[in-house]
Amino acid sequence: GLGGAVIVRLAVYLKGKDAKKYRKNVEYGSARWGSKTDIAPFMDPKPENNIILTQSEGLMMSGRPKNPANARNKNVLVVGGSGSGKTRFFIKPNLMQMHSSYVVTDPKGTVLIEVGKLLSRGTPKLDKDGKPVRGKNGKIVYEPYKIKVFNTINFSKSMHYNPFAYIHNEKDILKLVTVLIANTKGEGKSGDDFWVKAETLLYTALIGYIYYEAPSNEQNFSTLVEMINAMEVREDDETFKNAVDLLFDALEQKDPDHFALRQYKKYKLAAGKTAKSILISCGARLAPFDIKEVREITMYDELELDLVGDRKTALFFIISDTDATFNFLVSMAYTQLFNLLCERADDKFGGRLPVHVRCLIDEAANIGQIPNLEKLMATIRSREISACLVLQAQSQLKALYKDNMDTIIGNCDSSLFLGGKEETTLKSWNSLLGKETIDMYNTSVTKGTQESHGQNFQKLGKDLMSVDELAVMDGGKCLLQIRGVRPFLSRKYDITKHPNYKYLSDFDEKNAFDIEKYLSTRLPVRPGELYPNYEITPEELAAQTTA
């Protein structure tokens, strides 16, 4: 009895004292590929309600799943070298889902041509019970997307975009100046931000004057350029006043505390020679607006950026993949878009837009820098906005956003690698995938007077995919990593299997979207333009009917 209890107690003590922590079969790493079970909680049973990522994996559009632990933001980082299929395997499949509004960067303008007809057909109109509405003929009624296009390759095939149309207060003026400075080049001395600060003062003053004092049809970049051109400076005569000086003198008489006047007075502290240098830098920065086509395309606005989240809209930014001259206009539009949608969500819709807005930013490194993108990526999620950054290599993001690159990538809950050989990208994915534990079996033979044989079993760690394996990955395969989920090695999405594929021009050339024809059917109303009104009496109408 007692002796047995002592022995048992002693055995337990000795075992505990000599206890070791074992992790069987994961000694060198627990990495493994994801399975259907891993992705199931993150996908909607209805395929049309998902973001398409691979042939077998997706992400539910609902931001509030039944289990809050399964909530993920919809920001996606897509990396793939040239020819890896970023458009075919990611952008077009997601446009075919048609569950959101879309803002698409479209290099060369081919995506709009290929999917435009599908979007103009739209989605079935639903009643309050979520069932399709049918017309008198029994056919389902469809609601077409509102298609907008801003074309920096051919301005004659573009709608108008006027950044001034979205200025509503002094804060908006400062935002516009910030994005203008960030995406255009002046002629200041390298490494000295004095010139940038001086230009900022002048732009803020002039744009403030235009917004508060000019008629609506003159609130555009054309007026800004004319004001810069009218600002003659005489180095030998500090008392000389140019036409713009006289405008601000008159403004001071009317409102001594005017926002624009306060900024202009700060600019005027510069001496004649310095002021002249500032104007030269401003002239260089605004040089694109001296081009007649650019001045005309920014004369008034048709894009309605603030309404993209109110109704299903598809906005296409067509950019050149070889010439970045006018890409700053697209960056400016993206910056205004994010700010406008966030403000509209907060001010009008209680924090969430009625229609989710997905920004599919192809060639994200080529449109220029979007100021504060690292902060926007973290805050847009709650407003029903998401951004998909599509790049050829991660190093492109580093070159554009410097130390903020990691923050931007960290705010993308999903990362998709379609293939490539850029070293930074390969090393990043190699590290992300981790190591697995494998079994190694060695045999040995020792020959001599007596031959002996040996066997050795041991475990070691191996990269789930090494750098060289990543570089030669099958062109039909891709890698997907979703936050908190095992990585997936899957097939790229087969676009021909999508139920809406038959409406693309890929399926039938007759489905090609005619941009010129679409734009010609619109009758744009320009600010300040007068239109004649005609009245027809009932007698005249009756006479016309019987004639």
Regions found by a protein language model. Give the residues of each.
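Short alpha-helical interface patches
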Residues: 1-51, 170-180, 227-230, 451-482
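Basic- and hydrophobic-enriched, low-structure N-terminal and domain-boundary segments
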Residues: 1-84, 88-91, 125-136, 446, ...
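A broad, low-specificity signal for short, low-complexity segments enriched in glycine/proline
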Residues: 35-42, 55-68, 274-280, 319-321, ...
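A short glycine-/small-residue-rich loop at the edge of a beta-strand within enzyme catalytic domains
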Residues: 37-40, 328, 364, 420
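Conserved long hydrophobic alpha-helices within structured protein cores
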Residues: 47, 53, 328-335, 429
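P-loop NTPase motor domains
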Residues: 67-385, 400, 405, 468-489, ...
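Short loop or secondary-structure boundary microenvironments that flank
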Residues: 319, 323, 363, 391, ...
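Conserved ATP-driven motor cores of ASCE-family P-loop NTPases powering translocation/secretion/packaging/pilus
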Residues: 377-479
